[in-house]
């Protein structure tokens, strides 16, 4: 799952992991017996300390077959949240808020494509 959290100024939350290059949308795996909705809420809290208010809205689902056979990535948008404490320390090196039209150069390719689909109206690619 990946979270597209958008603040009141229209900026998108991105995270820089300690073990991956570049900026990513917050997210991760779905735990056993966990829904994708619950997973994205949990990941957002763990990685960024944001507590979703209301249900996240499913935007798209993408195959991640070339990197992980059988894997899919569900992308959710979250526009209402409270700021709390991060519960995952050591995994996230940096958190940043960026305008979708002024993203850093090193945003992950899949994340950049999802943001273009959401904010620029680019066609949705079925692959991550």
Describe each PLM feature range:
Residues 4, 14, 75-77, 97:
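Conserved hydrophobic/aromatic beta-strand scaffold that supports enzyme active sites
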Residues 7, 11-47:
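Conserved Nudix-box catalytic region and its N-terminal flanking loop in Nudix hydrolases
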Residues 21-22, 90-128:
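Nudix hydrolase/Nudix homology domain
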Residues 62-85, 111-122:
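Active-site-adjacent beta-strand/loop module that shapes the phosphate/pyrophosphate-binding cleft
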């Amino acid at each position: 799952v990946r979270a597209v959290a958008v603040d009141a100024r229209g900026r998108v939350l991105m995270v820089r992991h300690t073990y991956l290059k570049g900026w990513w949308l917050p997210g991760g795996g779905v735990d056993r017996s966990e829904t994708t909705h619950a997973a994205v809420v949990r990941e957002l809290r763990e990685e960024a300390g944001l507590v979703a208010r209301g249900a996240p809205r499913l935007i798209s689902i993408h195959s991640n077959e070339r990197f992980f056979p059988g894997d899919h990535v569900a992308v959710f948008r979250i526009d209402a949240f409270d700021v709390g404490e991060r519960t995952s320390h050591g995994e996230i090196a940096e958190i940043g808020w960026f305008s979708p039209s002024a993203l850093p150069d090193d945003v992950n390719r899949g994340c950049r494509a999802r943001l273009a689909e959401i904010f620029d109206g680019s066609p949705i690619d079925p692959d991550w």
